[in-house]
A protein has these predicted regions:
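C-terminal non-catalytic regions of proteins with extracellular/luminal or membrane-system context
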Residues: 1-182
Length: 182
């Protein structure tokens, strides 16, 4: 989730999930106090730092391939432009966006946490309950956020997917769902 070393000081003492062991107790998967060291691609962050320090008037563009959320406070302040892709886009399309030939239309498919403490505070079984990163321009990197040439994307997709997070248990009538979707 981030490049630099981090110790999980605010993680739960006891994990929410865990398999039942042979003796009937639940496995504790807590990572409280565990230190994650620099990631193997830490050199990417160092290259970005170098580019930021030496680019002058040339915009620094970051194209980030992602498989999960990340903590952006190490990256966003160093970049003029951030493009997120999920390993499914063709590289020529990413180049076309950078060159201004194709307008970006994508939305974030998961929340981007403000920091690791927000990740640790998240309830794994509650969707979209995380405090999200807000960049220098005031954009919050929440689920279904995206920018195009005109600014923040506001279309049918964002109306559909920007619903308020579920914060309490809701009942679900499966029979009614089945009947409505036949």
């Amino acid at each position: 989730l981030q490049y630099g070393e981090y110790t999980a000081d605010t993680a739960r003492e006891t994990s929410i999930s865990g398999k039942t062991l042979e003796d009937g107790t639940k496995e504790n998967r807590s990572y409280k106090g565990v230190t994650a060291h620099e990631v193997p691609n830490y050199g990417d962050l160092e290259a970005l730092q170098y580019a930021n320090e030496n680019a002058g008037d040339v915009p620094v563009i970051v194209s980030m391939k992602m498989e999960r959320g990340m903590v952006w406070d190490e990256v966003e302040p160093l970049a003029d432009v951030i493009l997120v892709n999920y390993n499914v886009q063709r590289e020529d399309i990413v180049a076309e966006v950078i060159l201004g030939q194709t307008e970006p239309t994508g939305l974030l498919v998961f929340q981007q946490p403000i920091n690791m403490e927000a990740v640790e505070a998240q309830q794994e079984d509650v969707p979209r309950d995380m405090e999200c990163y807000t960049d220098a321009a005031g954009n919050t990197y929440d689920f279904a956020f995206g920018l195009n040439w005109s600014g923040k994307i506001d279309d049918d997709r964002t109306a559909k997917y920007s619903a308020e997070p579920i914060s309490k248990v809701q009942s679900f009538d499966y029979a009614a769902y089945e009947a409505a979707n036949k």
